[in-house]
Amino acid sequence: MNTKFAFSAGVWNLNTGADPFGPAVRPERPLEEKLTTLKALGFDYVQLHDDDAVPMDVPAGQVEAYARRVKAMCDAAGLAVEFVAPRLWEDPAFVDGAITANDPRARAAALDRAKRTIDIMNVLGTKRMVLWPAREGTYIRESKDAVHAFGHLLEYLNAILAYDRGVRILGEMKPNEPMDLMYLPSTGHFLAMAARTADPPRVGVLIEAAHCILLGLDPADEMAYALWHGKLWGVHLNDQNGLKYDQDKSFGTVDLRRAFNAVDVLVRNDYGAHGEVVGLDVKAMRTQPHDAAMKHLSNSKEVFERLVAVSAAIDRDEWASYVSSRDYEGLEMLIVRALMGA
């Protein structure tokens, strides 16, 4: 059982409160301030999109120098970079998808962006690329040939693996939003794709709790499945009020028992003992004032750490006795009492 964890969050988790229905309600924080804030909150790593690190309008010949300045900022703040993720969903060139676009020029641009991301990663000191295929799907099924689309996804993964023999790809799957019908909507789908790549040992998953809930699945079971495969290389912990849009609520604030089970499966299976990081992908409520718009991060970290303590302290012999006697009512109360501090 591992009870010692390192923590990370994305720079996007310190945001302005803008949403699809309203503008920003807080000022934007400069990158350097975001980094120092994360460190002050007790985080060890930062997560970045490619254009968080190096904006897309930076000329190709200046990308490395720009990335070096960001690396110096991270070093000064005392943060390592956990991963970099290519942002393949905002550019108008990817309106019909990036990796699975019908237009071969869009697919080529998506691969160029992945290569640029890897070049940035190498400067920032990480070999971990998180791939969220946000627009890889359809609004109507007839618009794309799904068999060809899966082939494009495999070609894309193989091209990334060939570009840098040290890179590791972490697929982060989600069933919907922004696309109505997503290709590879679940962990299992991506792991099946990973097995078909040219180098399966370098392809794993990052599991986001809210995405599992949107699938109608339990995050703990999804994590367990990836752990069984030896493929759980990252997590995004948060919470979710049911099957709706991706809310990124503070971890454990909706369903504490579900959160406990996610923590417990990580603790019991030594997640973190081999360099894996606990990522918190949570948003401040739009109502939060600017100077309090970081409590969602500290609160989520505290909930995780408290649940680790519950997992470590719970009587495993009593737990096992309830299982062996098939007394699941007794087991349920053991868990509930532990969560209530009774």
Predicted regions and their residues:
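N-terminal pre-domain/capping segments
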Residues: M1-N122, P200, S298-A342
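Hydrophobic faces of well-ordered beta-strands that scaffold small-molecule active sites
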Residues: F5-L14, V46-L48, L79-P86, M129-L131, ...
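Gly/Pro-rich active-site loop or hairpin
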Residues: N15-L35, K144-F150, D180-L191, H211-V277, ...
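N-terminal cationic-hydrophobic initiation segments that often serve targeting/anchoring roles
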Residues: K39, K71, L161-A162, A194-A198, ...
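Glycine-enriched alpha-helix->loop->beta-strand junction motifs that scaffold or abut catalytic
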Residues: G42, K127, D199-R202, L227-W233
